[in-house]
Amino acid sequence: MPEPAKSAPAPKKGSKKAVTKTQKKGDKKRRKTRKESYAIYVYKVLKQVHPDTGISSKAMGIMNSFVNDIFERIAGEASRLAHYNKRSTITSREIQTAVRLLLPGELAKHAVSEGTKAVTKYTSSK
């Protein structure tokens, strides 16, 4: 039996027709996916504390993991506290209590004072 005539070649695996239709003349086919990171903030703090010191990409990766881990722990604890108190909103009070519960002694005191300072600065700039 004769094969049916093909009008156009089959699209390659993973390609999408809609992408080629909406494409403009100078655009590339795929954009680089954005990877969120705390790297710029870690670098800014490093330069405030030690202006003449650099950081390797491996160390930056570790710092990024550390910040993500602490963020998740504080957010989880604050969420639990809000749930216990039958609240649907996480406020600075829940965050502060979560920090006190998660961080040990002197570190918690410093974190709370820095957090309070940051919130005060933010509310005064509004």
From Swiss-Prot:
Ubl conjugation is among the record's keywords: yes
Predominant place of localization: nucleus
Biased composition (Basic residues): 13-34
Annotated stretches, region: Disordered: 1-34
PTM annotation, UniProt: Monoubiquitination of Lys-121 by the BRE1 gives a specific tag for epigenetic transcriptional activation and is also prerequisite for histone H3 'Lys-4' and 'Lys-79' methylation.
A Pfam family annotated for this UniProt entry: Histone
SUPFAM superfamilies in the cross-refs: Histone-fold
One example GO MF annotation: structural constituent of chromatin
Compartments (UniProt record): Nucleus; Chromosome
Role of this protein: Core component of nucleosome. Nucleosomes wrap and compact DNA into chromatin, limiting DNA accessibility to the cellular machineries which require DNA as a template. Histones thereby play a central role in transcription regulation, DNA repair, DNA replication and chromosomal stability. DNA accessibility is regulated via a complex set of post-translational modifications of histones, also called histone code, and nucleosome remodeling.
Family note: Belongs to the histone H2B family.
Name the record gives this protein: Histone H2B 3
The gene coding this protein: hist2h2l
